[in-house]
A protein has these predicted regions:
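Vicinal oxygen chelate
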Residues: 3, 23-31, 33-44, 73-75, 89-177, ...
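Core segments of cupin and vicinal oxygen chelate
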Residues: 30-33, 39-82, 108, 115, ...
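Short loop/beta submotifs within extracellular cysteine-rich repeat domains
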Residues: 59-60, 81-84, 92-93, 108-109, ...
Length: 321
């Protein structure tokens, strides 16, 4: 018999934002997934390779050339989270490309989602669907592909023995690493349809949501796992649906900003968006997170987050069951 979970929400107004936050008693859906990889399409691969390795300080876990012409490098942000840098070929437009969500059982995820109503992808159904499981090459991971209603690609991925990601996880020795891939942002074209997809079909818990001061836009944080989230916003009038930015958690934001400036990143004002810069630190409202933005050579935004005691993300983590 399917268990019904009742949700109780508290509404709080913070700096003009209406924040709706689940009560501490809300139970976790625990869909068996966690954010593990976000893909980056680079305009200048060599420049981006230097940026992520020497400036950001991320370890190159492994590299490969899928077609003998373009290149991919996996950078290890933490023991089990990665950024996948890809050399743009046919489409030179830089940006974030796709999401991997780690699972211990891809077959079970596919079966659960199909039972929930996510249809198999086909020649005539290319969004709001999921593919059959496969062994991805050359990484040797077991994975499937979900395409959400906006065309965003999500790959449930199993780090099976012998896969390149499993080898990278097992060989991780950086005990002092203080960074982790925590949030990926998406912009969707049909907000209610996407809400239905992520809440009812994917089974993600609403960690918290808030509306813009004018009430015209809603941002929803879905909790994928205890410490990883999907941040969903409606696409801007002049924009296209897709991935918007990532959040990287750090234990000491000021120290990380100082290290990045020492590594050569120019300082930027809080609202600056210039490539190869890091902005001043501030507290983002209404999530109450200490943050700064890094813009890579392609203009891709990496939001550095230090979780304060009253941060909404920290509260969501602490209430995860």
């Amino acid at each position: 018999m399917r268990r019904l979970v009742h949700f109780v929400f508290a509404a709080v107004v913070v700096f003009g934002f209406l924040v709706i936050q689940p009560s501490a008693a809300q139970e976790s859906a625990n869909p068996g997934l966690s954010l593990s990889v976000v893909g980056i399409g680079a305009k200048d691969y060599a420049d981006s390779l230097n940026f992520y390795r020497k400036v950001m300080g991320f370890r190159p876990a492994f590299s490969f050339s899928p077609n003998g012409k373009t290149h991919n490098t996996y950078f290890q942000v933490s023991r089990d989270t990665f950024l996948e840098l890809q050399e743009a070929a046919a489409n030179p437009t830089p940006g974030l490309t796709h999401i991997h969500m780690q699972t211990g059982d891809v077959d079970a995820i596919v079966a659960r989602l199909r039972k929930a109503g996510v249809a198999p992808c086909s020649a005539t159904l290319k969004t709001g669907c999921i593919s059959d499981p496969r062994i991805a090459q050359p990484t040797q991971e077991k994975s499937a592909t979900i395409v959400d209603p906006s065309g965003i690609r999500i790959e449930p991925t199993q780090f099976i023995p012998g896969s390149l990601t499993r080898k990278a996880v097992d060989s991780w020795e950086n005990k002092s690493a203080a960074t982790r891939l925590m949030v990926v942002g998406i912009a969707v074209k049909d907000y209610p349809e996407s809400q239905n997809f992520y809440e009812k079909l994917m089974g993600f818990r609403v960690a918290f949501k808030f509306s813009s001061p004018d009430g015209q836009r809603t941002t929803t944080y879905y909790q994928i796992s205890r410490d990883s989230f999907l941040e969903m916003q409606p696409v801007a009038a002049d924009g296209a649906p897709g991935l918007t930015h990532v959040h990287i958690q750090t234990e000491d934001l000021n120290a990380m900003i100082a290290r990045l400036r020492q590594a050569g990143l120019a300082s930027g004002a809080r609202n600056a968006t210039t490539p190869n810069t890091v902005t001043e630190a501030g507290v983002t409202q209404p999530s109450n997170v200490k943050s700064a933005n890094v813009f890579d050579p392609n203009g891709i935004r990496l939001e550095l987050n230090e979780l304060l005691p009253e941060s909404l993300t920290k509260k969501a983590m602490e209430s995860w069951k």
